Amino acid sequence: MPSLSSPTDVEIAVAQRYSAGAQEVQPALCCPVDYDQRFLAAIPEEVLERDYGCGDPSRYLVEGDTVLDLGSGAGKICFIASQVVGAAGRVIGVDLNDDMLALARGAAPVVAQRIGHRNVEFRKGRIQDLAVDLDALDGWLASHPVTDVSTLATLEAEQRRLRAEQPLVADGSVDAVVSNCVLNLVATEHKAQLFAEIFRVLRRGGRAVISDIVSTVEVPDHLRADPELWSGCISGAYQEEAFLAAFERAGFYGVHLVKRDSTPWRVVDGIEFRSVTVIAYKGKQGECRDHGQAVIYCGPFKTVLDDDEHVFPRGVPTAVCAKSFEIYSRQPYAGAFQLLEPAVAVDPATAPLFDCAPQTAPPTPTEPASVVRRAVSGLTTAGGNATTGCC
């Protein structure tokens, strides 16, 4: 069996394995998952049989969401999500494999008729490059064949045009990005771009809900070179802690491990591979402004440290910028903090930059009614950098 030596080799190995999986059920690609049975009756059996996932990110969707499913395959998660988000929501599946797309697109009208609304569409693209619509590019290539360097340059120009004028998925256009055991199929060289693309397409306040396979230690090179193991969701798996760190590097906050299987799915060369589901949020970018707000961390831990190294002692009023105040008021932090508004509201148009240094001046009338701020009478600051949008 030939070994993998490039991202193209990885893509070919995955395409061949999943094209076969579209034609005939591949049990080795399945990781047992308990789905909500209420949503399965409307889905054709040929789709259910070709479920090659390892989790159920649809459990974390809400009515009205616009959802993007990366590596949508036969469409099972999309069709479940369609029912969860309802007629007011929308679901977009993206996959590169023509055989899987044909299966999903063929099932879509059947599901729509059974549930009473049609809010699912399937698009062709690479999940690490959500700007290029490959159906549109295929159509262009049909009448503009590439035969030499000159026509290759024309192809590259068309790709740039598609990115700018007709992106497959536009910036900030979805509420939730889900994926079910697919990120590990992307070549290592393209994984950083993949996370950047997830971040790009999410709206501010949106979330990524990713189920995938992770490993206890970094996968060694000899396993990464095995096409059978790569297309089987093993060789491309993130090491467990590195998977969480990838969300942070991409700019997400509130990275939350919501499910981790205690029993490994597989053990290869002594390395455990198991399913996890992670939720991460977008929206901490931007400058920090001082609206005279504070929060109290309620416990149970003595002190907590957030992703930007802001420190919150239990029970101690802590000044925060307006952006952080908003973030701590919603998931995944809702309920962990008591929110303290100032007695006199601050005009956002004139609010100063949030000063992270200790203060020695007396409090102003904009201070919260029940506390005074920072060093003056014991109110601490969470810290950070006001000018770079630290929090």
Features from the language model and the residues they span:
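A short glycine-rich, Lys/Arg-flanked "PGG" loop and its adjoining helix->strand segment in the class I
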Residues: 192-207
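Conserved SAM/SAH-binding beta-strand->alpha-helix loop
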Residues: 97
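Conserved alpha-helix/loop element of class I SAM-dependent methyltransferases that forms part
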Residues: 32-66, 77-84
